[in-house]
From Swiss-Prot:
Serves as a base for tail tube protein polymerization and acts as a template for tail length determination. GO terms for biological process: viral tail assembly. Residues 59-82 form a coiled coil. Keywords: Coiled coil, Viral release from host cell, Viral tail assembly. Belongs to the P2likevirus tape measure protein family. The keyword Coiled coil applies. InterPro entries: Phage_tape_meas. This is Probable tape measure protein. The lineage of its organism: Viruses, Duplodnaviria, Heunggongvirae, Uroviricota, Caudoviricetes.
Length: 846
């Protein structure tokens, strides 16, 4: 009504969204409190204005407005209080976190500053100390003075910088030369050559130092120029075959010593060694095998046993050697020439069989060949013969290698290779590292004297302190304890501050913040609840869902609940429909067997009632479930399942097409694979399906035959029971008697009640006549004849047909409407006929 006035304060979707967002965290809760407070203040102001306007209308509900105004004011105060408390807790937590981070940063910063400051100094001192220690080892081994040691050290530092080799590498090379017996000052002068050859050949510095010593001291190759020529020959010779210099560097000192023992020295000895190893490597499996073969040959040549063996074989070894040496051959080459002539006397058949056995690795066959051809009398092992045969086959290559190693091109190999190596980034990086290391040595050398003096000064003090500590242990314990206490208190103070912050203050603040947050959320919840709104939507927003999404989701769940309620009602309707259906199905069996019919009717009633009750119970359960889903957020999972099932039903066509495409791909892939193996996939599955159907049909046929036999047996038993027990031989005659009884009973009943029906009809006619007379009297009192009234007035017919249409297809509904209209039309016609007949009777009587 117009006089009724009602104002409801509803905190709607905006406040709901703010409340939902506030649940995501403390910071968002604080922001949500601010927004809600602003909204509440605005609502409070509008409510006050509404109260002011309502004062002018006494009929309006001022008391209700006042109550809402007060409640909203209290809610605003609570929200503001919670907002202030939460802001304070957050500020406290931020301050504690900043304090903790500041303390940790100070400690880490102090440590990092100390480490960063000390790292280069410590590195420089360590580098200088390491170089000084290596240099001192060389000086001690070579009996050098301090000045000589310093000069050699400077020479090695310059060599390291010039050749891009590290200081430690140069120290190792020079130390190897000195340890081998070379003069320390001379070894220091060889540092530049060592570094340059190491960079050019990429060989190990220790192996190169051994080569320098063997060249200089063993072969007598003196001077830097001669040594450089020797390395040029060796480096160039290593490129003439498959045996590089860095691979043969370890074996060269041994080979040079063996050649020097045979009287072969100088550049020729080195040339013959390199050329022999290159040729021997062609017939050997590896470089080590080639070295072994040459070693055995050198130990065999010129031995007394070898000379005697040749003498027994009819060869004057010494005379032949003298002639060959006089002809320009070395003793090594002369021994090879003598042996080659001896092998050639055995023919080419020996060499073919020897090579065939060697290719198979059959040493036993080679030994038998030595015995059969008489070689075992001269040569004691297989390695000797292998070297001899390799040199015999590659003698021309051996001579050419010697010539090439002495050419002008070969004598510039080290410089050319060094220039090419120096262009590499790795060498440039090594040069950079060497420069840094040299700087460290320079800085460290400047600090080492002071540090050494300091340590020398402190050491006696430490000794006196040790003596004093031994004499006064109690005082030492006190001093150490005091110092430890001071440091410990400093550390403990920092640690306690950090620990108090982390383990006490921060957790307490977190707990207080959590409690404040919970209180703020509860205040928001009460404000939200007081403002109204959907309960289910409110619950969803409490768990962090947005206002719009929560409202939509609640509406979806409500519709789902309504759908379940509809399912429940449908189940009830189905239950009611199934009751007569069940009864009808059961009644179809009534007929020939009356006793069984009565039992069937009883069973139908029982089953029908239980079925209806069960369906009604299921319907109520579904109805309850729908209501629960509408009101309880726990039903989200069930609703999600139902929605998923509906979506599958709704979009079954694209889903079926998608999985049909996958199945087609799988079938195509398997058909291709099985087709490659010769297996027909469709035929295989067709055979499998035919076997399956055949088994199913056979099983059904067998079971159907058994069921048919059972029914026949059951019918025979029932017939026999009726015939024997009840004495019914002919059921048709029994039912004829039943029909006679029914007709006779109907006749008796009609005869008994005919008088009652006649009296009722007479009474009805009397009442109709009395009513007609009363109507004529009323018409006469009105001043007009009854007939005139009837004749002069029109006929007013109120016809309101009611048509009940069951659900179904459009054609079915149309047919039902037509049938209803036809029935209603016949009723209308009958009613009009009765009306006209009554009118004629009244007119006639008038």
């Amino acid at each position: 009504m117009a006089s009724e006035f009602y104002i409801g304060v509803k905190i709607g979707a905006t406040l709901l969204g703010s409340f939902g967002a506030a649940l995501s965290g403390t910071r968002t809760t604080l922001n949500g409190l601010g927004r809600v407070a602003d909204e509440l203040r605005a609502r409070h102001t509008r409510l006050g204005d509404a109260m002011a306007r309502a004062v002018a209308h006494p009929m309006r509900n001022i008391a209700e407005l006042r109550g809402q105004y007060d409640r909203l004011g209290r809610t605003i105060d609570q929200v503001q209080a919670k907002q202030a408390a939460l802001a304070t807790r957050l500020a406290r937590g931020a301050a504690l976190r900043e304090q903790r981070q500041g303390l940790g940063a100070d400690m880490l910063g102090t440590y990092a500053t100390a480490a960063a400051t000390a790292a280069p100094v410590i590195g420089a001192v360590r580098q200088a100390a390491t170089f000084e220690a290596g240099l001192r080892d060389i000086a001690i081994t070579g009996n050098l003075t301090r000045d000589e040691e310093f000069r050699i050290g400077e020479t090695m530092r310059r060599a390291a910088l010039a050749t891009s080799q590290g200081h430690n590498s140069i120290l190792e090379g020079v130390g190897t030369l000195v340890a081998a017996g070379m003069d320390a000052k001379e070894a220091g002068q060889k540092s530049n050559l060592l570094g340059r050859v190491a960079t050019a050949t990429n060989a190990d510095m220790k192996d190169l130092a051994g080569m320098v010593y063997s060249f200089s001291e063993t072969l007598g190759i003196k001077g830097d120029a001669a040594l450089k020529e020797a390395f040029n020959r060796a480096a160039y010779g290593g490129k003439l075959g498959r045996f590089e210099l860095k691979d043969m560097a370890k074996a060269l000192p041994e080979m040079t010593a063996a050649f020097a023992a045979k009287g072969i020295k100088g550049q020729d000895a080195l040339t013959q060694i390199i050329a022999s190893l290159e040729v021997g490597r062609e017939g050997a499996g590896s470089g080590d095998e080639a070295v072994t073969n040459l070693r055995n040959w050198l130990s065999h040549m010129n031995a007394k046993a070898t000379i005697d063996a040749y003498k027994k074989a009819g060869v004057d070894y010494q005379k032949s050697m003298s002639n060959l040496v006089a002809g320009g051959y070395s003793s090594y080459e002369g021994s090879l020439q003598i042996a080659q002539k001896f092998i050639a006397s055995r023919g080419d058949a020996f060499m073919k069989q020897w090579k065939a056995a060697g290719a198979k690795g059959d040493e036993e066959a080679q030994r038998k060949l030595m015995e059969s051809f008489g070689l075992n009398e001269v040569f004691q092992d297989i390695q000797t013969i292998n070297h001899l045969l390799a040199m015999r086959q590659g003698w021309d290559k051996y001579q050419q290698n010697k010539k090439d190693m002495g050419s002008a091109q070969a004598l510039n190999t080290i410089d050319q290779d060094y220039v090419r190596r120096a262009e590499l980034a790795t060498v440039a990086w090594g040069r950079f590292q060497t420069q840094i290391a040299d700087l460290g040595i320079t800085v460290g050398r400047a600090l080492l004297p002071s540090l050494t003096d300091l340590m020398n000064t402190v050491t006696p003090l430490i000794q006196r302190t040790a003596q004093f500590a031994a004499a006064h242990p109690g005082l030492i314990r006190g001093v150490v304890g005091f110092a430890t206490a001071v440091i410990g208190m400093k550390v403990a103070t920092l640690a306690a501050g950090w620990g108090l912050n982390f383990f006490v203050k921060s957790p307490l603040n977190m707990v207080s913040t959590a409690l404040t947050t919970v209180g703020a959320k509860w205040t928001l919840f009460r404000a939200l609840w007081a403002g109204g709104g959907s309960r289910l939507s409110t619950v969803f927003q409490i768990f962090g869902m947005g206002a719009g999404a929560a409202g939509k989701f609640a509406a979806v769940i409500g519709r789902a609940g309504s759908l379940f309620m509809g399912f429940g009602r449908g189940a009830l309707v189905v239950g009611r429909a199934l009751l007569p259906f069940g009864q009808g199905m059961l009644m179809t069996f009534i007929g020939p067997l009356r006793l069984l019919a009565q039992g069937g009717m009883l069973l139908a009633r029982v089953l029908g009632g239980q079925l209806v009750n069960g369906l009604m119970l299921a319907g109520r359960a579904v109805l309850w479930l729908g209501r629960a889903l509408m009101l309880n957020p726990i039903g989200i999972a069930i609703t999600a399942i139902a929605v998923g099932a509906y979506l599958i039903y709704r979009y079954w066509t694209p889903i079926k097409q998608f999985f049909g495409g996958i199945w087609a791909s799988i079938r195509t892939a398997f058909a291709g694979v099985l087709g490659w193996f010769g297996v027909g996939l469709p035929k295989t599955f067709t055979d499998f399906g035919s076997h399956l159907i055949d088994g199913l049909v056979n099983g059904i046929r067998n079971r159907f035959t058994a069921a048919k036999n059972t029914l026949i047996e059951f019918g025979s038993n029932v017939k026999a029971w009726f015939a024997n027990t009840l004495g019914i031989k002919s059921p048709s005659r029994v039912f004829m008697g039943f029909g006679d009884n029914i007709a006779q009973g109907a006749a008796i009943g009609i005869g008994r009640s005919s008088a009652v029906a006649a009296r009722a009809a007479a009474g009805m006619a009397t009442q109709a006549a009395a009513a007609a007379s009363l109507q004529r009297i009323n018409a006469a009192r009105g001043g007009s004849p009854a007939g005139a009234s009837v004749a002069g007035s029109g006929i007013t017919v109120h016809f309101s047909p009611t048509i009940t249409v069951q659900g179904g297809s459009p054609d079915g509904v149309k047919d039902q409407v037509k049938q209803g209209l036809n029935l209603s039309l016949r009723d209308l016609e009958r009613m009009l006929d009765d009306l006209l007949a009554k009118r004629e009777r009244r007119a006639y009587r008038s």
